[in-house]
Every structure is written in C-alpha cells, then in structure tokens.
A protein has these predicted regions:
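Patatin-like phospholipase
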Residues: 1-37, 47-299
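Gly/Ala-rich beta-loop-alpha elbow adjacent to hydrolase catalytic centers
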Residues: 38, 42
Length: 299
C-alpha cells in the first residue's frame, strides 16, 4: 500500500500529531509511506517522521513548558525560542527517507510556493524552513526567498493536501498512485471534498477529537503536551484498527473511511476552531497559486 500523510499547522496542537502518528506506525510499515507534507509547525511532525526523530520532537515540545501566550510570545520574539528549536532539530547528519513538502507564503501577494526536500540534510534547506515556520505575529520580519518576501505557509495552505495529490508523479519515490492519504488537522468542519476531486481514498481527521476537541493553541505546558500525545495515541490506535485490521481491496478501504467520516460528522459539526479563520486567507492563496510554477525541488 502506498500512503501519503498531511500534517496541518497548529502551533502547540501539533503535539496531537505525534501521538496519532506513533499509533499509526503500529499498523503501517513506514516504507509504505511515500510522501509527507506539513505546514507551519506541522513541518516539525513531517520531518520527525521522515528522519526518525519523534523522540527529539517530543523533548522539544516538553522542554518549552510554557502555558501563558504572552510569555510564549516573549520567549519567541526576544529570546529566540523557535530559532533555537529549529537549529537543534533540523541538523547535519539527518537523513530523510520520505519526500517532504512544505508551503511558504509570498508576501504581500499571498500566493503559495511549495518546496520539496528528501535524502541527506542540506544546510541550504534551513532558510526555506525558517520562512515556512515564520508566524508574522510571533517571529517578526518576513524572510527573503528567491528575491521575494516569504512568511509562514499556513497563511495560504494550512492543510497542504494539494502537493501530495497534484505532484506525486514528479516527487514521490514510487511511480504508482497513492492508495490512501491521511490528513491530520485541527479544523473539525474541514472537508477536502469541497476543493478536491480525486479517486484516492482520503481520511481527514481532527486529531483533537479524542480530547473533546480541546485546542489551547499556545499552551506548551508539559502536562498539556503529555495529554495531547496520550489522547491522540489512543485515537490513532482506534482508527488504525478500523482501517487496517483487514487487508482487503481499495473499495473496502474507501467504505471504512466513509464509515469513520459519518460516525464523526455530527460531533465535528458541533465544534468550531480558530483554525477556521485561516480558511479565508487559504482561499485567497489558492486562488493566486500558479499551478504551473508553484513547486520547487531542493534535493
């Protein structure tokens, strides 16, 4: 089976993705994961999967241990917290076994650019990653990428499914089509069907569902990080059991995905999230995206 994974941005909430992905790997061989994409802080998750650094990523989340948004803002802007985390996590000696894509936002036009990395770590990547994880309200000035101002990719594509579906023939390690895409996001009312028409089975999940959709965007307290990882791990085990307990046809996989979607639909519609606010900017970014020239290979 050929699988693609999509990790949305979500600041501290991306800790949910750690637990869910660890559970998923109990049922899926990592070699079957052919592509990953991540936006904003979701890039950390995608990179951790591709480079086998989930333990290091969990340590980074727990070492922050800040619950107050203003204190977090001070530590990022004044003390360089995010810069230090990136410098220690994205490092020489890393090797990516899964092609990874992430978006940046060209500013002030708000158009989208996607960058692909794979293989041995190249220090050249860091400036692109810094631009892609560059919250305007937290990190200060935009970065300059290819002679253009660039900011956090979550502004234009916080759930980067597009490059996984559209560019797989060029960037994936397999020439076969994907058999399944799993999207891990934090917007309960998200529905990829409104934007994409595809025959590939797609499971989109709000990974905070098993924790009553609890979303404290700026809470990096150690106890809360532990809670997010633990509840999403349980959720991941439950869904993986439903998806992969039987090795059968793609049609049956689609049927089980639809069953999961319908079983969660009503509960998801009763909840909202600040992540929904990004959909306004994401709509603009996608409208301004140049499909013929929005991807760049960095490996």
């Amino acid at each position: 089976m050929n699988i693609g994974l999509v990790f949305s941005g979500g600041i501290s909430k991306c800790a949910y993705q750690i637990g869910f992905t660890r559970a998923l790997l109990k049922y899926v061989d990592k070699k079957d994961i052919k592509a990953v994409s991540g936006s904003s802080m979701g890039i950390f998750t995608a990179y951790a999967l591709s480079s086998n650094k989930f333990d290091e990523l969990e340590d980074i989340y727990k070492s922050i241990n800040i619950a107050n948004p203003m204190r977090l803002f001070f530590n990022v802007r004044v003390k360089g917290l995010l810069t230090r985390a990136m410098n220690s996590f994205f490092a020489l000696g890393d090797s990516l076994s899964i092609p990874l894509c992430f978006p940046t936002t060209n500013f002030p036009i708000l158009s989208t650019k996607y960058f692909w990395i794979n293989g041995e770590y190249n220090p050249f990547w860091k400036k692109y990653i810094r631009a892609a994880i560059n919250f305007p309200f937290l990190c200060g000035m935009p970065k300059i990428i290819d002679h253009k101002f660039a900011i956090d990719g979550g502004a234009v594509d916080n759930i980067p499914l597009y490059p996984i579906l559209k560019m797989q023939d060029e960037y994936l390690t397999t020439k076969e089509n994907l058999d399944l895409v799993i999207i891990m996001h934090f917007y309960p009312r998200y529905n990829y069907r409104k934007e994409f028409k595809t025959n590939i089975p797609i499971l989109d999940i709000d990974v905070s569902l098993n924790n009553n959709f609890k979303k404290r965007h700026f809470d990096f307290s150690r106890d809360y990080v532990d809670e997010m990882i633990a509840t999403s791990y349980e959720y991941g085990i439950s869904l993986s059991e439903k998806l992969f307990s039987k090795k059968d046809s793609k049609d049956n996989l689609t049927e089980r995905i639809n069953e999961i979607f319908l079983s969660e639909y009503n509960e998801r519609q009763w909840h909202d999230s600040a992540d929904g606010f990004l959909t306004v900017f994401n709509t603009i970014g996608k409208a301004l995206r140049n499909d013929s020239d929005c991807n760049k290979r960095l490996f």
